[in-house]
């Protein structure tokens, strides 16, 4: 039998040196997980999850907007005495997802565990948890970035974006959300092992990179969290609100670097010759899962 082998480098000991305390390191920040539809999957079941949604009456299969939009003509529903109305049928849409398994591995020898002055295994376990949390956040971000309901600031494609986020763009998104009966979020998931919700004031939540904070603060009518009074932030990373939006920032919601219009005289940040495009994830109640 061939035994598996591996090599690894242990952290160097601080022999012959004054041993200071173990300093804190930057911890990942999860923000997208406070919303969305999250379900626990029972053990020993299929890897494929199939959700079903019945379309509202009259909804068209053109795109995700029309699939969830009612089309009802009152005149077509007038009844005639003695005549049974024509029966309608429900039209389902199945949304499927395949489960994926994620993990990470650190290695430590018994010598390190027995002789090192600090608890290396405990630090490894801590970093495993933090790393998996960031993986989970990146999976969510990838799913949301793949959405097809997209609005562009100062352009019609990502490659033509040449303006910062504006209130006009936010209002366009708001109109579409409301036209599709998207409910404002009134509860966010609590940060605990049990899936529960905490009530919040109704609003559409906006998630974006921390680089976007200056643009958000420049919006007309922006209210900083320090001015909320009795109103509670939805998350420690919430920076404020404007009209029916509440803004949450995170350093992990990375931009599409060097992918917009030519920087030119736009004054926008770029890591190359083109504008860096920052996604703003705007969502209503149960908009994703």
Where are the regions a protein language model picked out?
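N-terminal "assembly arms/tails" that initiate or stabilize quaternary assembly
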Residues: 1-97
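Sequence/fold signature of self-assembling virion shell proteins
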Residues: 2-32, 160-185, 211-289
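Short, low-complexity, charged/polar segments at coil/turn and helix-coil boundaries
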Residues: 27-66, 164-223
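Oligomerization/assembly interface segments of phage tail-like spikes and tubes
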Residues: 49-51, 101-108, 126-127
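Short loop/turn segments at secondary-structure transitions that flank enzyme active sites
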Residues: 57, 103, 112, 134, ...
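Short acidic, glycine/tyrosine-flanked loop/strand segments centered on an H-E-D-like triad
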Residues: 88-116
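Extracellular structured ligand-interaction cores
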Residues: 103, 201-203, 244
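Alpha-helical scaffold segments that mediate packing/assembly in large oligomeric complexes
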Residues: 112-192
